[in-house]
């Protein structure tokens, strides 16, 4: 399995930086005043293969299966610097060994990001997000996310694919339990709260050992799948997008969320993963989001059956 990052996450974060909510300016969590210069110097040293590698996520060996499996021997790729991030790595020993390999044997010594679906707790398990939302208590949601971040980061996981902030109004959809329900206002409050819980109140809080990157998913209208069938198409107007489905994502962005995830569905016949409207016009130009975007599980590969790419190589372009 692999997810392809639309922007090189590992490269950016390995030099201790973050994207601010402004347009075009970068901020270092550690206060580094020369961060753009340092990033440019690393980029100048990278081969095309290394750049592509840093934009690619593989799955660590795990008993957890959440989609199609691609069995890949990651160690040779790791030594070449061709892995930007790993999914499903939850063992502190395995994470340490992987990171040591990347830092000792890859040419540019770029650390690996370790990601996991920390949805409603890591070791300590909390109520599912839908149940938690019934309390109408944003502070409680923030506290549970903060505890989960502390536990996950303690073993080396530094990126969670949460919160899921999809508005869902059809109980037949199989992922209603992962979000906050049908109300955009409540969804927005809890979206921002969970981002603060995972990441902290300020950008520099991500330097803390008990915080991790959050990811607002799935952009957008994934919960509006027709007939509640997962991965199905959606039929929503731009007004519905802006009034109902966008607000929790905008709240996450305003709370400083570091990453966004694409959605499997299509909107107006265009797969979200390849939507210029969503990711350039709205996310980048309108909202001025300068973080990075990750595709959902094999979503780029699925652009082929969507009919917008002739093959997987074309889809990756």
Regions found by a protein language model. Name each.
Residues 1-28:
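Bacterial Sec-dependent N-terminal signal peptides
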Residues 19-317:
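Glycoside hydrolase catalytic-domain context in secreted enzymes
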């Amino acid at each position: 399995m692999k997810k392809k990052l639309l922007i090189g996450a590992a490269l950016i974060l390995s030099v201790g930086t973050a994207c601010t909510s402004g347009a075009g300016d970068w901020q270092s969590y550690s206060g580094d005043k020369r961060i753009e210069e340092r990033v440019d110097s690393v980029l100048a040293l990278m081969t095309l293969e290394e750049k592509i590698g840093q934009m690619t996520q593989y799955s660590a060996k795990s008993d957890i299966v959440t989609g199609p499996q691609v069995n890949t021997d990651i160690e040779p790729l790791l030594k070449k610097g061709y892995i930007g991030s790993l999914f499903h790595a939850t063992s502190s020993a395995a994470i340490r060994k992987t990171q040591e390999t990347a830092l000792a044997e890859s040419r540019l010594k770029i650390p690996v990001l370790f990601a996991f679906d920390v949805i409603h707790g890591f070791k300590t398990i909390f109520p599912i997000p839908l149940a938690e939302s019934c309390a109408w208590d944003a502070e409680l949601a923030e506290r549970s996310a903060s505890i989960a971040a502390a536990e996950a980061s303690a073993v080396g996981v530094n990126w969670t694919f949460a919160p899921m902030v999809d508005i869902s109004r059809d109980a037949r959809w199989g992922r209603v339990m992962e979000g906050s329900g049908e109300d955009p206002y409540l969804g927005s409050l809890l979206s921002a709260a969970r981002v603060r819980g995972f990441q902290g109140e300020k950008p520099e809080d991500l330097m803390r050992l008990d915080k991790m990157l959050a990811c607002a998913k799935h952009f957008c209208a994934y919960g509006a799948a027709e007939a509640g069938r997962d991965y199905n198409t959606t039929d929503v107007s731009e007004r519905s997008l802006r009034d109902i489905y966008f607000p929790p994502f905008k709240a996450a962005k305003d709370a400083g969320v570091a990453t966004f995830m694409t959605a499997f569905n299509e909107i107006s016949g265009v797969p979200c993963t390849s939507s210029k409207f969503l990711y350039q016009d709205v996310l980048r130009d309108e909202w001025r989001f300068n973080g990075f975007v990750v595709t959902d599980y094999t979503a780029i590969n699925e652009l082929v059956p969507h009919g917008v790419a002739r093959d997987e190589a074309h889809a990756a372009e």
